[in-house]
Amino acid sequence: MPIQVLPPQLANQIAAGEVVERPASVVKELVENSLDAGATRIDIDIERGGAKLIRIRDNGCGIKKDELALALARHATSKIASLDDLEAIISLGFRGEALASISSVSRLTLTSRIAEQQEAWQAYAEGRDMDVTVKPAAHPVGTTLEVLDLFYNTPARRKFLRTEKTEFNHIDEIIRRIALARFDVTINLSHNGKIVRQYRAVPEGGQKERRLGAICGTAFLEQALAIEWQHGDLTLRGWVADPNHTTPALAEIQYCYVNGRMMRDRLINHAIRQACEDKLGADQQPAFVLYLEIDPHQVDVNVHPAKHEVRFHQSRLVHDFIYQGVLSVLQQQLETPLPLDDDPQPAPRAIPENRVAAGRNHFAEPAVREPVAPRYTPAPASGSRPAAPWPNAQPGYQKQQGEVYRQLLQTPAPMQKPKAPEPQEPALAANSQSFGRVLTIVHSDCALLERGGNISLLALPVAERWLRQAQLTPGEAPVCAQPLLIPLRLKVSGEEKSALEKAQSALAELGIDFQSDAQHVTIRAVPLPLRQQNLQILIPELIGYLAKQSVFEPGNIAQWIARNLMSEHAQWSMAQAITLLADVERLCPQLVKTPPGGLLQSVDLHPAIKALKDE
């Protein structure tokens, strides 16, 4: 086949494979466009979980008639014009791919009007060449996007959609995350004609805790400790739940934002977990809603197709900063609560040195302790002050927010007599669920670790293999399958075909979906860890392995796959090692307690120390 330029629709559909995973992906991209347009009200209408209709209506600035056709074209955007703009990006969108990708796998209609125009205009793309048609329409200032029949022209993708309830739950979760990021925007969500969520905008200086409670629940609000922490260009604000009262339900609340962009960043999660480690049980997770503000030049947001991940230029600095910010609030909580009256000379309190996998602590310097209000004591009406407008909070932020908490709780708990302390189990050591902190990388694939004064070497490829095996091994539910945009078709022998058919149920639990005919097998979906692998090599080797087996256990197959996956890292960096260890500690805690052979080797420094002393 000769080299040729792909038709626009096919090119957009390929891009949609990364951008548009499910209806929730469409909602996220379109709502972020509305926020970038300055909207203060966004109405979202969903039908049949988003498979039939997704309608996003906003009161933003709108799009000019002359730019409507461009809005549906690939790589057309108003957010950036040069590489310098990309490196300092503050808007949520910037690639100009979303609308083109969505319109290629659905029937998309874009209606918009700007304040300077007397009438609105409507645009839609159709045909193989994605020609855009523009016609007059009636519409107030703002934009409405209608997405009908998602994946109507890609049946394979539509087949992988879950139930209507499941898909809507994903949309609901996306809206929760966005509502937590933008307290100044009213967001209404309806499903099949019924209003499901109404998040009203909080006026400047208003009580953001009301919206926090509506989204995260009263249980989180009651245990929330407010954070305001700053160092240079870094600012951390938000709430973390008291680890001593964290429940499994609360542990599901883990929201972090970087410059207003919702993230699932492992480095941030690791720093928070390390700060709470000595107060959490072995199986507990922290609950938090945190906002990190950082110089846009110090973070790269262009590392994930859906912009779910970021890369910090100084990851160790960010890790230590977040760790110390969370730790300071938890340490303050241990102090005796003080009244709300201003303390003219607050006593300084030294923050203990932290233990983090990211390395040396840059922030363990004395900090001023803010008075912490008792959580259940009603405040006098005459002595209260309005909460400082978040995120531009003034000093004393935690004290002011304590007042808000008590006003929201309304019903104070009755005074109780102090109880004698109950015997408690000894707390786990802070390092009990951690390999230690990474000091440096040795010989490109080993991490030098320090834990409790002991030095050890960890083989990063071995840790990566154990992590892959944990990711591939099915638990209570099968591993999630990721559909391939272009299925892999392979020729197989009769023996190989028979083995595949016997192993089909086990492979399905691992997220591997295939279809076979007389002499061929077509791989239609694989689990996420396999998406970046060379399947042309891996799958034939897997089929050969299965042909030699008589028993097909998902665990054994997952172990074989993990051992045969190619590593993504030829030369490991500190940031990659920290991220890997955070994932291993979270998914494979048993490796910390009883490391298998070949993973961890202690380093005896006593001969070297003795030799130095003998000189």
Swiss-Prot record:
Region (Disordered): which ranges? 362-397
The GO terms describing molecular function are:
ATP binding; ATP hydrolysis activity; ATP-dependent DNA damage sensor activity; mismatched DNA binding
User: Which InterPro entries does this chain map to?
Assistant: DNA_mismatch_repair_CS, DNA_mismatch_repair_MutL, DNA_mismatch_S5_2-like, HATPase_C_sf, MutL/Mlh/PMS, MutL/Mlh/Pms-like, MutL_C, MutL_C_dimsub
Q: Name a biological process GO annotation.
A: mismatch repair
Listed under GO cellular component are:
mismatch repair complex
Keywords assigned by UniProt, alphabetized = DNA damage, DNA repair
Superkingdom of source: Bacteria
Question: Which residue intervals are annotated with compositional bias (Low complexity) in the record?
Answer: 378-391
* Pfam families recorded: DNA_mis_repair (PF01119), HATPase_c_3 (PF13589), MutL_C (PF08676)
Stretches assigned to coiled coil: none
Q: Which SUPFAM superfamilies match?
A: ATPase domain of HSP90 chaperone/DNA topoisomerase II/histidine kinase, DNA mismatch repair protein MutL, Ribosomal protein S5 domain 2-like
Its family remark reads:
Belongs to the DNA mismatch repair MutL/HexB family.
Q: Which HAMAP family match?
A: DNA_mis_repair
Q: What function does this protein fulfil? A: This protein is involved in the repair of mismatches in DNA. It is required for dam-dependent methyl-directed DNA mismatch repair. May act as a 'molecular matchmaker', a protein that promotes the formation of a stable complex between two or more DNA-binding proteins in an ATP-dependent manner without itself being part of a final effector complex.
Official protein name in the record = DNA mismatch repair protein MutL
Q: Which source organism?
A: Escherichia coli O17:K52:H18 (strain UMN026 / ExPEC)
